[in-house]
Amino acid sequence: MTKSLIVSPKTAKDIDSRIDRVLKGLGYPEPPLRLEDVRELLRLDLRFYTADNPGYLQEVTNRIFVGTKQVFQRPALLMDAISKLSLQALYLPDRKRILLDDNVPKLKHRWNEAHEIGHSLLPWHQEMMHGDDENTLSQHCHEHIELEANFAAARLLFLRDRFTEEARAMAEKFASIKSLQTAYGNTLSTTLYRFVECIGTEKPVVGVISGHPHISKRTDKFDAANPCRHFIQSPAFAQKFSNVSELEVFKSISAYCGRQGGGILGEDEVFLEDDNGQKHIFRFETFYNRYDCLTLGVHLAPAKSPIFF
């Protein structure tokens, strides 16, 4: 399970200013954002590769230079890494080229492309990609640059604060997420992420992406110890409900969801305990799009304590 992380305020401000310059250069467009217009503005090239036809990737990796130094003296190592790590996209700074895996479902191309555009906009990412020391290659460093690229992608695809303003003006229900998904042309999963983050700065909100929760619909890949692929915490939820586990939340979701093959699987009021031991009521709603199960949980009120006489 992947818990959502939060970019530091200073870095977020820097990234956001770079995204604003891009959108300003495009004349602050209406949604959905056309990524081909972004590529044209930034003079980025887009190509596709597939694991079963690596010829193009072989050619590219043979030509990657920084100055006069060839970064990948053994291009086969990069190709092997792409295969083993299941990389779905790649940005080549010196050639200003984005590579997308054509085997990935088309619905995911948009996010993957925006993620690589995010890398291209952040100069310190390009420095890290060019480096070869231990700090550059550390897992900690990798997680940070991926987090920042995701933040940049979200601010770009959702047109910075425009999405935030629209999300906060709508009902805190899954129907709003579906409406915004249509308007902005992004996937339900990425729209759920942004919706949770935008409406949950002061109110605790949680989102979950998992497989079908009903016991009769679970696949052979279901992992009872890690049932959630993503556990999305709004800033307020992360601050006040840091001890809530994915297992606890998934158990609550499973309790009210039906075995339907698509659409709304159910909704219910769920009790979660904050970091001070106080129970709170959340309204949970779960939707299944036949690929992923998406859950939105919104804080309603503190639970009333029983009165004894």
Label each PLM-derived region with a short phrase:
Residues 1-309:
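Active-site hotspot residues in diverse enzymes, especially metal/ion-binding acidic/histidine motifs
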